[in-house]
């Protein structure tokens, strides 16, 4: 991949290097990405007839997360739909895909949190696919072009699905938020839902969001 050091950026109709401005979301590529996703959804549905809706959130940089609503004529159909998408062209670079109910608005991230909180059993509904294809630019991959993928089944089980006969899911005690805040290195802890605790940490020697790590990378 070429490396360019720019001193000034201008624009014209016949650009020397046509490109979008990327960086910490939201940026120009974010809105273009959502528009492209909406435009190509009918094409995807022609090849994958179970797909009802698909959304790659800007907040996760597109290739890190996909939310797919699937038809549900038989048990675990959402999982089958999600697995099919993981082999569909550039979607093979996805890291995480979440299957949701047919009536779920895939662009409503609050509804996604509700589904993850109320319908996902960690022991049964998280499927890890080890050693799958990764993007060459994926910074978190342990090896070049290889990483694990995660499929989350956040659909409501059908009556014929053994998942539908399990006990109702339980949340975490509110005291856990206070306990987590007291852990060394934890700056902030907050419940997003009754079973979802998010913590902000500070790693000693780690870069701040305002710091440029380019020189450190070159030295390494």
What residue spans do the PLM features occupy?
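Charged, compositionally biased interaction regions
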Residues: 1-220
């Amino acid at each position: 991949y070429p490396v360019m050091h720019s001193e000034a950026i201008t624009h014209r109709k016949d650009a020397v290097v046509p490109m979008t401005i990327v960086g910490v979301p939201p940026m120009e590529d974010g809105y273009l990405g959502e528009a492209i996703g909406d435009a190509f959804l009918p094409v995807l549905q022609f090849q994958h007839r179970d797909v009802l809706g698909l959304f790659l959130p800007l907040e996760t940089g597109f290739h890190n997360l996909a939310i797919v609503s699937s038809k549900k004529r038989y048990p675990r159909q959402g999982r089958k739909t999600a697995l099919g998408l993981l082999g569909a062209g550039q979607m093979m670079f996805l890291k995480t895909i979440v299957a949701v109910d047919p009536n779920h608005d895939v662009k409503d991230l609050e509804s996604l949190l509700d589904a993850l909180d109320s319908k996902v059993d960690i022991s049964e509904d998280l499927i890890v696919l080890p050693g799958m294809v990764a993007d060459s630019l994926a910074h978190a991959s342990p090896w070049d072009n290889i990483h694990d993928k995660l499929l989350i089944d956040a659909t409501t089980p059908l009556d014929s699905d053994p998942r539908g006969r399990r006990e109702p899911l339980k949340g975490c005690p509110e005291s856990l938020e206070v306990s987590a805040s007291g852990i060394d290195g934890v700056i902030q802890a907050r419940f997003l839902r009754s079973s979802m605790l998010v913590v902000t940490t500070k790693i000693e020697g780690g870069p701040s969001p305002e710091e440029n790590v380019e020189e450190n990378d070159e030295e390494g």
